UniProtKB/Swiss-Prot annotation:
GO terms for MF: rRNA binding; structural constituent of ribosome
Cellular component terms per the entry's GO annotation: ribonucleoprotein complex; ribosome
One GO process term, biological-process aspect: translation
Organism of derivation: Limosilactobacillus fermentum (strain NBRC 3956 / LMG 18251)
Signal peptide interval: none
Name assigned to this protein: Large ribosomal subunit protein uL24
């Protein structure tokens, strides 16, 4: 997967199109990511020791990784991601600007 936790991304399709956020968690096997503040759902929580009152809580649901694009760190615009080998290490590169991402 070309996305990592902490990356700034923009949603490019779906009901949250145009929203930006950082990736909180990635699920590589399912090709899904959780983006902060995007794809909010309401979850009905039963009372438990951690939450004695229970109730309805807002949380983010995972979205498909193909529905988000990484933001180029230099231009803050969505870009595709490529890979290059530099000094024997594989690094991510922004296709628009050609700059290294990590």
């Amino acid at each position: 997967m070309f996305l990592k936790t902490g990356d700034k991304v923009r949603v490019i399709t779906g009901k949250d199109k145009g929203q930006e956020g950082t990736i909180k968690k990635t699920f590589a096997k399912e090709n899904r990511v959780i983006v902060e503040g995007v794809n909010k759902i309401k979850k009905h929580q039963k009372p438990s020791n951690m939450n004695p009152n229970g109730g309805i809580i807002d949380t983010e649901a995972p979205i498909n990784a193909s529905n988000v694009m990484l933001l180029d760190p230099s231009t803050n615009e969505p870009t595709r991601v490529g890979f290059e080998v530099v000094d024997g290490k594989k690094v991510r590169v922004a296709k628009k600007s050609g700059k290294q991402i990590d």
